[in-house]
């Protein structure tokens, strides 16, 4: 650790910011618990860049029924989240990405529990720490993203699991 402290952080990239305040920020490399990140700056997303062309080809191959299924999945999930008494949905309208929190439950623990059920979500403040935590005063959030890869059964499973809250 003492050796790592001798080096300046020269590159900053994705995943390197621990916290953001109105007039300051904390880099992971400056946090004694995350000192190793000084040597792991965020990298250009080369894999994603290369895959973009293939993704566009795939997107162009989709049928209208695929688009209809996605729209139905989004509306079904939105209606469920909006009407659940313990869920606070941030979205004002249906969208492929929806953010929410559950009153009285830690979002990170709920995210882990959903993962155990085969449901992948993101938790936290999604790179807008200061705005969400300090200005909006939200607890850490859960974010669900739906896409063409999600089946109607996926959404039904998610709703079944969240219904137990």
Task: Cite the ranges covered by each PLM segment.
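Pyridoxal 5′-phosphate
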Residues: 1-165
